[in-house]
Amino acid sequence: SQPQEPRRITGTITDTKGEPIIGANIKEVGTFNGIISDINGRFALSVNPNAVLEISYIGYVTTTVPVKDNKVLSIEIKEAEQSLEEVVVVGYGKQKKESVTASIASISRKELVQTQQSNISNMLVGRMPGLIAFQRSGAPGEDASSLLIRGVSTFTDNTAPLIMIDGIERTNFDGIDPNEVESLNILKDASATAIYGVKGANGVVLITTRKGERGCPRLSYSGNFALQQSTQLPSYLNSADYATLYNEALENDSRVSGSTYQPKFTDKDIELYRNGFDPILHPNTNWIDDFLRKFSTRTQHNINLSGGTERVKYFISGSYFDQTGIYKHTKIDSDHDVNPRNTRYNFRTNFDFQITRDFSATVQMAAQIGRVITPGSGNSGIWQAISFANPLSSPGLVDNKIVRIQDGLGSVNPWQTLLSNGYQKDNRNNINTTLRLNYDLSSLLTKGLSVHGSIAYDSYYYSRKKYSKTFPYYLARRDAEDPDYIYLIPQSEESIWSVSTGWDKNRKVYMEFGIDYNRTFGLHKTTALILYNQSKYYSPSLQYYVPNAYQGLVGRLTYEYASRYLAEFNMGYNGTENFAKGKRFGFFPAVSLGWVISEEKFFPKNNIVKYLKVRGSYGEVGNDQIGGDQIGR
């Protein structure tokens, strides 16, 4: 008998409301044959006899439809709802949500970008249970939050969680554009983090970046512009009240010491402070209003392209971010501005290649190019000067000159603090590259068995230029012959700009090789993982640092019966050169159990408690962030 010829079918893809789905993926199961729906949700495809179609679209439940004898199909797909079938990212793998026995919190990209912030750590504040965040500054480039998972877990000064981006340890967490993120998971207890061994004591943040989906190219743009302002600013005394209270303090001192009371300010001085008729020699400076803008700006733009075929899928993203400071009058000349500023460019490409039916590859590259400008005195130094400056010490800037008053009580001048300490310009460049290969051995050895290998190369370069210049300050004096005339006497000379430079660079190479097993036998489901990894960190710019290496062996075994009884064992055996010889390696095991009570026959079916799981765990983890370099310790 001769094989039957392929036949042509047509159809329409709609949602539950009858609206056409544009760009839905229609694939003949078991082949590379497929197409996407057009603007009206229609498609035409030649298929083999007895073909089964798989229809998928982002945000909708994947649906399979047997063709049978139909020549025209009307296919309805439903929106996906979050369920226990949802897959969550765990250490070196993925698990169904219903099978997880560890403590894991998750947030999706859609939820993440609902809060527009300058970095991801600030987007997480108040969004995930067990996560504690401290924001110590609001200055551009310094406003990232410090994160703690379930509080302080170690005795060292570094209590930050381990950051894993697409399975690789990386530190440029807050430089990632949130539009590049697919999901973010936090591993909180030892049963979840023991697989990271000596690095898992402070918890782990797992970031998975976006990948392409099969279908036509999708171009997406997002942008936002924000005005930022201080949430709360202190109120200070005006000059008249300050002078009055200063006189009262002198009077109280004289009573205690028995000396003659001599007021510092006359009634006429206080009246001039109050009425503002002599604004230079009797100023009433509100340093908050004089020094700070009402608003600063933040701008963010992202454009990304995604799509793919059965063989190649891609995600390409580029973004721009800019955040300005809140100080006034900081542009010294056309080339120099001491106002804080954070500017960043992000680029990312993720490619997935299905080379054969069993062999696949992933190539990822990300770059962050950033520049941060900070005042030479530091933002904390400027705020300290504003807090300590009294309102009668200076009229501020007069004709763009820094002016002091002879009787300013020795107060600091915030303008001199800001302008005469110059500024620092930091350039920070990160490049991350990853190659991952995966081979499915199901057809060669046994079903559910696969091997994978990864290699990553990360490079970081930092350069600093510090610009310094001394600005003259002037003393205001009244002309003895013409009391209406006030002249400014220079008290220091202006210097030319000087520049000092510095730099730093480092690189890291990471490799891993793993064997995965995932198999279901009736009501029994088991998974296993054995993985070897190593990394080497090198920083040639630092005098006393020597290359730092890490090696580890990772294992995981899970068992599930009837989606009811769950057991999991994780272990990490790893070591680092941060410790002395003979004490570099440690074994970190963890075991966890789970019982899905709601799957038992005796559990009453109701709409109040639909799912109930009890779990418990025990594990040991370590911390290698003990500070300093090997020789210094």
Question: Where are the regions a protein language model picked out?
Answer:
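Short loop/turn motifs that connect adjacent beta-strands in outer-membrane beta-barrel proteins
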Residues: 212-217, 310-311, 326, 358, ...
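Transmembrane beta-barrel strands of outer-membrane/channel proteins
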Residues: 219-227, 318-320, 363-369, 453-459, ...
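A surface-exposed, glycine/aromatic-enriched loop/edge motif typical of exported proteins
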Residues: 229-267, 368-408, 461-484, 612-633
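Structural signature of Gram-negative outer-membrane beta-barrels, strongest in the C-terminal barrel
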Residues: 354-356, 499-510, 518-633
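Small-side-chain secondary-structure face that scaffolds active or pore-lining regions
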Residues: 321-344, 366, 372-376, 381, ...
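Residues on the lipid-exposed face of transmembrane beta-strands in outer-membrane beta-barrel proteins
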Residues: 209, 221, 303-309, 349-353, ...
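Short, small/polar-rich motifs associated with maturation and membrane association
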Residues: 1-347, 361
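Flexible loop and strand-edge segments within Gram-negative outer membrane beta-barrel domains
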Residues: 230-232, 279-319, 323-327, 338-413, ...
